[in-house]
Curated annotation (Swiss-Prot):
<keyword id="KW-0413">Isomerase</keyword>
<feature type="active site" description="Proton acceptor">
    <location>
        <position position="93"/>
    </location>
</feature>
<dbReference type="InterPro" id="IPR008794">
    <property type="entry name" value="Pro_racemase_fam"/>
</dbReference>
<dbReference type="GO" id="GO:0050346">
    <property type="term" value="F:trans-L-3-hydroxyproline dehydratase activity"/>
</dbReference>
<dbReference type="Pfam" id="PF05544">
    <property type="entry name" value="Pro_racemase"/>
</dbReference>
<comment type="similarity">
    <text>Belongs to the proline racemase family.</text>
</comment>
<feature type="binding site">
    <location>
        <begin position="94"/>
        <end position="95"/>
    </location>
    <ligand>
        <name>substrate</name>
    </ligand>
</feature>
<protein>
    <recommendedName>
        <fullName>4-hydroxyproline 2-epimerase 1</fullName>
        <ecNumber>5.1.1.8</ecNumber>
    </recommendedName>
</protein>
<feature type="binding site">
    <location>
        <position position="251"/>
    </location>
    <ligand>
        <name>substrate</name>
    </ligand>
</feature>
<feature type="binding site">
    <location>
        <position position="85"/>
    </location>
    <ligand>
        <name>substrate</name>
    </ligand>
</feature>
<feature type="binding site">
    <location>
        <begin position="256"/>
        <end position="257"/>
    </location>
    <ligand>
        <name>substrate</name>
    </ligand>
</feature>
<dbReference type="GO" id="GO:0047580">
    <property type="term" value="F:4-hydroxyproline epimerase activity"/>
</dbReference>
<comment type="function">
    <text>Catalyzes the epimerization of trans-4-hydroxy-L-proline (t4LHyp) to cis-4-hydroxy-D-proline (c4DHyp). May be involved in a degradation pathway of t4LHyp. Can also catalyze the epimerization of trans-3-hydroxy-L-proline (t3LHyp) to cis-3-hydroxy-D-proline (c3DHyp) in vitro. Displays no proline racemase activity.</text>
</comment>
<feature type="active site" description="Proton donor">
    <location>
        <position position="255"/>
    </location>
</feature>
Length: 345
C-alpha cells in the first residue's frame, strides 16, 4: 500500500461521548503556544485539510471528536492536545480531557501509578489537572481541575421566530456557551427529543453569534459561542443537560466545559458555594460529578475553579491513511446523518 499519510488513533469514549486520540503520526503543528497552534488549525488551509481528513467521511463519522496529541509547551504539562470537530478546532473539552487522560495512561505514554496518577494537560484555554484513579492497570475514573470559568452575561434576551423571546446565560467554561432552560422551547431532555433539541440549538447558536459577540478577555483566539447547552433539573436534583453541536448532533456525555460554565452561573446567583458537589446527567443518562473547588478572577471578573469527574473507556485501536490518488482527501458530509447544517461543510 502506498500511503502518503498515516495517523494512529486510540478509540476512547467518556460516558458515551467518543473522543478518539491521535497517538501517532500527527504532523508538526506550527505555533509557539497551543493557542497559536489552535489559531493555525482554524485559519491555515493546511490546518483545515488535516482536520477534515480526520473528522469527515470517509475516514471520520458524525459522532465524537478527534484529539490531536501534541508535545507539551508548558514546563508543567505532561502532554498537550487540541480537539478537532466538523466546524473547527476547539480549545477545551471535559469529556475529551478524560478521553486523553485515559489514552495516555492505558497506552503507557504516561506512566500509570496506582492508586492515583496526576496528569497535567495543556490546552489552548490553559492547564487542566487530571487526577486519575488507577487499579490493576486500568484508569477507573478521572477528576479534572478545569480552567477558570466565568459568567459573561446572565439573562440575555434573544428574540426568536419559533419560541418568542428566549432568556439565556452566556458563560465560559473553557469555551463559550449559551445556557438555555429547555422548557422555554417546549421540550424535555430525553433520547426521543434529540433531533428536535439539536435543531433548536443550531437556530439559537446562529442567532446568538450574529447578535452578541463574545471574546475571552485574555485569550483572543477563543471567541464566539461554541455550543448551546439546554438544561433542566431532574426529580432527584441532578442537572440534566444536552449540549448541541454543529452541524447537528447531541453530546452523549453530560459535557464538562458546559457544566463548568453552568456552575459559574449557579455561583453568580448564590446557588453554589466552594465545596459544593452536584450531579449532572446527560441525554443518555450517563453522569458527571461537578464540584466547585475555589473562587478566582479572570481579567477582573469573578470566576470559579470547577472540577469534573467521569469515566473513560478504550474500545479500539485504528489507523487512518491517505492513498495519494484518493480524490476525497478533503472529506465530505451529508445532511442525512451529519445534521441539518452539514450542507455548509
Amino acid at each position: 500500500m502506498r500511503w502518503k499519510r498515516t495517523i494512529q488513533l486510540l478509540d476512547v469514549h467518556c460516558e458515551g461521548e467518543i473522543g478518539r486520540v491521535a497517538i501517532g503520526g500527527v504532523p508538526k503543528i506550527p505555533g509557539n503556544t497551543v493557542a497559536e497552534q489552535l489559531h493555525w488549525l482554524n485559519t491555515d488551509p493546511k490546518g483545515e485539510e488535516l482536520r477534515r481528513f480526520l473528522v469527515l467521511e470517509p475516514r471520520g463519522a458524525p459522532i465524537g471528536s478527534v484529539n490531536l496529541l501534541l508535545p507539551a509547551r508548558h514546563p508543567d504539562a505532561d502532554a498537550a492536545f487540541i480537539i478537532l470537530q466538523p466546524d473547527q478546532a476547539h480549545a477545551s473539552s471535559g469529556s475529551n480531557s478524560i478521553c486523553v487522560t485515559t489514552a495516555l495512561l492505558e497506552s503507557g505514554i504516561v506512566e500509570m501509578k496506582e492508586p492515583e496518577t496526576v496528569v497535567t494537560l495543556e490546552t489552548a484555554a490553559g492547564l487542566v489537572r487530571a487526577t486519575a484513579t488507577c487499579r490493576d492497570g486500568r484508569c477507573e475514573k478521572v477528576r479534572l481541575t478545569m480552567v477558570p470559568s466565568f459568567v459573561h452575561e446572565l439573562d440575555v434576551g434573544i428574540d426568536t421566530p419559533q419560541w418568542g423571546r428566549i432568556k439565556l446565560d452566556l458563560c465560559y467554561g473553557g469555551i463559550f456557551y449559551a445556557l438555555v432552560d429547555v422548557g422555554q422551547i417546549g421540550l424535555t431532555i430525553g433520547k426521543a427529543n434529540a433531533a428536535s433539541l439539536v435543531q433548536a440549538g443550531m437556530v439559537l447558536k446562529e442567532l446568538i453569534n450574529r447578535t452578541v459577540p463574545v471574546v475571552h478577555p485574555e485569550i483572543p483566539a477563543i471567541s464566539g459561542v461554541a455550543y448551546v447547552m439546554f438544561r433542566d433539573i431532574d426529580a432527584d436534583g441532578a442537572i440534566r443537560t444536552c449540549t448541541t453541536m454543529w452541524p447537528g448532533r447531541a453530546d452523549r456525555s453530560p459535557c464538562g466545559t458546559g457544566n463548568s460554565a453552568n456552575l459559574a452561573t449557579l455561583h453568580a446567583r448564590g446557588k453554589a458555594r466552594v465545596g459544593d458537589v452536584f450531579k449532572s446527567r446527560s441525554i443518555i443518562g450517563s453522569e458527571f460529578e461537578v464540584g466547585l473547588q475555589a473562587e478566582t478572577e479572570v481579567a477582573g471578573k469573578p470566576a470559579i475553579i470547577p472540577t469534573i469527574t467521569g469515566r473513560g473507556f478504550t474500545f479500539g485501536l485504528s489507523q487512518v491513511a491517505l492513498d495519494p490518488f484518493d480524490p476525497m482527501a478533503n472529506g465530505f458530509a451529508l445532511t442525512d446523518v451529519w445534521g441539518p447544517l452539514a450542507g455548509d461543510i
